[in-house]
């Protein structure tokens, strides 16, 4: 029986979707501070100080080609963090179908496309994948059918990927609650966090991602939940 290493895994070439803002940007900063190389994909990558590429994860074939190009330019990939995500709260019969489906496309189909394209490179180096679900990926609430469907789906996708790859790569699912990011910008008061909402600092959540990326090989963190200590939505 193989013995798991006790040495931390070095942080290397880490591809981060949604990496120019919010949680993704915090992860990119953490990767850089750990001595790794952040490789950012974002709809608007201009705010990122790192190697950054414009890409829309809903263009699944296009994003697969972009991931392949990034891997070629940097001689491979060591890790992927799928932090790109959107939401459109509202009742199912009130949200236009194309808007509802875009939430699924970004959060779930985009995640799968990026991981699919990165997988051959990760398999070569026993790389790691960190997918991003949500506390609403384990707990359903009203007016969140698209978001919950996508985030429940990310958990199912990640568990199946771990079973499929059987230790050839590390697979971790991050399950965060609300964070102090622009995620809630533009929402009506009905769906916006109140002034006393317990939102986590994305840097704190990013530290959990870095912990998973650096965990010793052979000892995998399959799922990790991170939230404010007074978060009421868990479980």
Across the structure, where does each feature detected by a protein language model lie?
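The beta1-alpha1 cofactor-binding region of Rossmann-like NAD(H)/NADP(H)-dependent oxidoreductases
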Residues: 55-65, 97
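Residue(s) in the substrate-gating loop at a strand-loop-helix junction
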Residues: 134
């Amino acid at each position: 029986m193989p013995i798991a290493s006790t040495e931390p895994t070095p942080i290397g070439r880490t591809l981060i979707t949604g990496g120019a803002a919010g949680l993704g940007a915090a992860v990119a900063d953490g990767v850089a501070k750990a001595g790794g190389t952040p490789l950012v994909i974002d709809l608007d990558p201009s705010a990122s100080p790192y190697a950054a590429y414009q890409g829309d994860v809903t263009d699944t074939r296009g994003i697969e080609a972009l991931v392949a190009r990034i891997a070629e330019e940097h001689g491979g990939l060591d890790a992927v963090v799928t932090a790109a995500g959107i939401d459109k709260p509202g009742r199912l019969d009130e949200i236009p179908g194309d808007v509802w489906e875009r939430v699924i496309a970004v959060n779930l189909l985009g995640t799968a496309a990026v991981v699919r394209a990165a997988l051959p490179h990760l398999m070569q180096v026993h790389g790691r994948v960190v997918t991003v679900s949500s506390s609403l990926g384990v707990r359903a609430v009203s007016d969140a059918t698209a978001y919950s469907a996508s985030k429940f789906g990310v958990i199912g996708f990640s568990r199946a990927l771990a079973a499929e790859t059987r230790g050839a790569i590390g697979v971790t699912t991050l399950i965060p609650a609300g964070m102090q990011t622009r995620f809630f910008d533009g929402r009506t008061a009905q769906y916006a966090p109140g002034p006393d909402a317990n939102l986590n600092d994305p840097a704190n959540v990013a530290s959990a991602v870095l912990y998973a990326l650096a965990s010793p090989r052979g000892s995998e963190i399959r799922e990790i939940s991170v939230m404010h200590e007074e978060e009421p939505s868990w479980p």
